[in-house]
């Protein structure tokens, strides 16, 4: 079977994406927990969240004019650095955890963006779906598995698994090819893609506020992993199920997505396991709608590089607000700051509905 043949490219794409997802999603789950264990303030934990998200809009903007050589480096170099960081963590992390976490968080962004841009150029069919499923499985399972491993054996085995996963991803990466496209003169409407911002807020909030908050309140790692895995599982299942749902208008998807994210504000009043699981599941569905249906709208209204830039920038800036922004607010003003954070998607979803109804209720002769 040819290395560059149709089946070869597809199989290597699945293997590489699954391995990378296993490695990175395992590390990203542990970083806020290690920071809490080492006594870092919420502001410093939020800095790791900033390092995880800020590179996405920056790299996506650079890649709008980048050639194939730079984008291929965007796959190989992050894998080498993440492998090195995982191995370094095996030898201890107490004295140099923060710089390693920031470096690793920064360099994962080019891998995602380079891979997403390359999907349309790889041989084989339905590569986007294969890619989503390949990283979606560890997104749904890694936190739960890593939580159990940490409780039983400690963090070292998470680093060992991550190092092995990045090594596998390196040797299974398909030969990335990038088709040159004519840059689109059309841009997606910001009002339709803005719900991705709120999806980013919840994701950053879950990983960099809820995780350390639960640990500080005595929850075991396997419970924290289960809560995070619930979110990931609903997102992954939503990707599949939404393919069989009758298409709605894009504003309807935006409104539904936004309204499904606001229940997180109830965590300001009481944090119990049933509430956590319910919020993770409901909000996970909202994020899934944003990341699938709104992404499809972006793809249909722009070329690949422009679409990736809009998608990653909108979600990435939301992630910054949900992680660093809420960490700082929580540290200085307390848990009640969750309420205005998640009143925003409620207000925006309501705005989209009222705006549409105001348009449709006008008579043809109305001014």
Language model segments and positions:
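Intracellular juxtamembrane helix-capping segments at the cytosolic ends
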Residues: 109-123, 288-302
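Structural signature of the two symmetry-related core transmembrane helices
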Residues: 72-87, 250-266
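Helix-loop boundary and gating motifs at the non-cytosolic
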Residues: 2-53, 187-227
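Hydrophobic core of transmembrane alpha-helices in multi-pass small-molecule transporters
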Residues: 18, 96-111, 197, 275-290
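Small-residue (Gly/Pro/Ala) motifs that create kinks and tight helix-helix packing interfaces
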Residues: 32, 141-150, 321-330
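Transmembrane alpha-helices of Major Facilitator/SLC transporters
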Residues: 52-62, 142, 226-247
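A late C-terminal transmembrane helix in Major Facilitator Superfamily
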Residues: 304-333
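Symmetry-related core transmembrane helices of the 12-TM Major Facilitator Superfamily/SLC fold
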Residues: 157-174, 336-355
């Amino acid at each position: 079977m040819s290395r560059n043949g149709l089946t070869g490219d597809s199989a290597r794409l699945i293997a590489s994406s699954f391995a990378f997802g296993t490695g990175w999603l395992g590390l990203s789950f542990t970083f806020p927990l290690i920071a809490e264990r080492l006594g870092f303030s919420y502001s410093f934990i939020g800095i790791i969240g900033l390092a995880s998200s800020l590179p996405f809009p920056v790299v996506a903007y650079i890649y709008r004019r980048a050639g194939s050589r730079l984008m291929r480096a965007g796959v190989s170099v992050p894998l080498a650095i993440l492998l090195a960081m995982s191995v370094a963590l095996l030898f201890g992390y107490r004295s140099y955890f923060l710089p390693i976490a920031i470096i690793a968080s920064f360099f994962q962004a080019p891998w995602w963006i380079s891979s997403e841009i390359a999907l349309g150029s790889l041989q084989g069919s339905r590569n986007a779906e294969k890619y989503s499923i390949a990283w979606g499985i560890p997104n749904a399972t890694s936190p739960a598995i890593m939580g159990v491993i940490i409780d039983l054996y400690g963090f070292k085995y998470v680093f060992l698994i991550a190092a092995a996963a990045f090594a596998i991803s390196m040797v299974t990466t398909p030969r990335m090819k990038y088709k040159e496209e004519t840059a689109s003169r059309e841009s997606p409407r910001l009002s339709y893609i803005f719900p991705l911002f709120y999806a980013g807020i919840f994701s950053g909030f879950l990983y960099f506020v809820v995780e350390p908050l639960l640990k500080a309140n005595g929850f075991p790692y396997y419970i924290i992993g289960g809560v995070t895995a619930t979110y990931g599982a609903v997102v992954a299942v939503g990707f599949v199920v939404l393919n069989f749902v009758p298409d709605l208008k894009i504003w309807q998807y935006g409104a539904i997505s936004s309204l499904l994210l606001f229940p997180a504000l109830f965590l300001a009043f009481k944090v119990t396991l049933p509430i956590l699981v319910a919020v993770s599941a409901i909000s996970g569905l909202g994020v899934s709608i944003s990341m699938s249906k709104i992404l499809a709208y972006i793809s249909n209204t722009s070329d690949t590089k422009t679409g990736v830039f809009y998608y990653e920038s909108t979600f990435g800036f939301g992630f910054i607000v949900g992680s660093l922004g809420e960490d700082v607010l929580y540290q200085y003003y307390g848990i009640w700051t969750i309420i205005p954070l998640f009143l925003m998607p409620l207000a925006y979803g309501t705005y989209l509905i009222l705006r549409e109804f105001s348009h449709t209720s006008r008579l043809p002769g109305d001014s």
